[in-house]
């Protein structure tokens, strides 16, 4: 869907050459990955987190040629201090101002992002529900498996939505 090209252009404009990332909802590390192109072709390092054990095992296998990538099995939760994003990043010794955060957990994306307070990635990638308008002022009243992302709501101070691909 063009994500690799969008990401490459943004990293070029920000002058990020050999960066760091965290991708959770990493799946098998290749399919639907927002960071694999950077790992494979730009020698990026970082953290891939996948909750599903089978997909995690595939990710471990697929990332064997890339020792700069840590692969973790577990869930990233917004309402559990032991498994929130800050804790995962802290345990993995991630830099406070790492380059890319890719969120693709098919639920609670907004709440996980909202509760990340200790780290400040330069670029944040969200999954959107392509069946809905990506810019709407609506959010489920409670966390759910409905992955609706409101681009305007995702903007934290100093952040601007740059694009959306379907």
Predicted regions and their residues:
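Conserved acidic-Pro-Pro-aromatic motif
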Residues: 37, 43-45, 96-103, 107-166
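SAM cofactor-binding core of SAM-dependent methyltransferases
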Residues: 1-88, 100-103
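Helix N-cap/coil-helix junction residues
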Residues: 16, 94-95
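Distinct, well-ordered alpha-helical segments
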Residues: 83-89, 112-117
